[in-house]
């Protein structure tokens, strides 16, 4: 689609364009047209049933993502995180949110996910939650796969998706739908400004 993308991550295994901690980063206003942030989700996850949660650490990362968005003031921004405790943190209050089940976009598991986003992205969107027509449920109406690293006590007998990259991935169909809407927003903005639409700069922040 003609996008120039810059990836940011603290983990070298993902080979990001910028290897850094987002809490130590600053960008100038207008640096990126679009920002997609996926702050780490493990300690926000409702699937975490062992060990203490380090919410101060995870909050500091999520807040850094929001700070960068405020600094850059991109035309479009999205903060992605599996539905869990992040939606209840005080600093997320008031942000527009779109909630989707990944199984409705072709994923082999439900993985209900919150997408916090700029007002222009949220316009016209309704939550897309599983209605049992996703093709991933058994005869009892339960999802056959669980997106977590280990068996689910809540769903005995369900298969689990243990590979890290698989658990972190966003369904391609959902990505395409989001990109189409972003293209429309960028094109409309370009027409209003008298500029030639197309292309753009995108930033991605750490995996969640």
Model-predicted regions and their roles:
Residues 1, 207-208:
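Accessible peptide chain termini
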Residues 1-29, 34, 92-99:
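Adenosine-cofactor binding site in Rossmann-like domains, unifying the SAM/SAH pocket
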Residues 25-31, 41-206:
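Class I S-adenosyl-L-methionine
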Residues 38:
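Residues lining the SAM
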């Amino acid at each position: 689609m003609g996008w120039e993308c810059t990836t940011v991550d603290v983990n070298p295994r993902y080979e990001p364009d910028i290897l850094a901690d987002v809490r130590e980063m600053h960008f100038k206003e207008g640096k990126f047209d679009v920002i997609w942030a996926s702050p780490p989700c493990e300690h926000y996850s409702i699937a975490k049933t062992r060990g203490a949660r380090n919410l101060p650490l995870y909050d500091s990362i999520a807040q850094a993502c929001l700070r960068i968005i405020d600094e850059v003031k991109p035309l479009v921004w999205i903060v992605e995180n599996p539905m869990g405790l992040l939606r209840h943190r005080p600093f997320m209050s008031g942000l527009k949110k779109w909630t989707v089940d990944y199984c409705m976009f072709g994923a082999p598991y439900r993985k209900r996910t919150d997408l916090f986003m700029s007002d222009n992205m949220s316009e016209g969107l309704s939550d897309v939650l599983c209605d049992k027509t996703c093709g991933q449920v058994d005869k009892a109406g339960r999802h056959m796969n669980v997106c977590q690293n280990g068996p689910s006590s809540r769903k005995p007998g369900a298969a689990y998706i243990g590979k890290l990259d698989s658990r972190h991935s966003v369904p391609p169909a959902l990505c395409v739908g989001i990109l189409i809407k972003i293209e429309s927003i960028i094109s409309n903005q370009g027409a209003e400004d008298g500029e030639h639409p197309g292309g753009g700069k995108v930033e991605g922040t750490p995996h969640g």
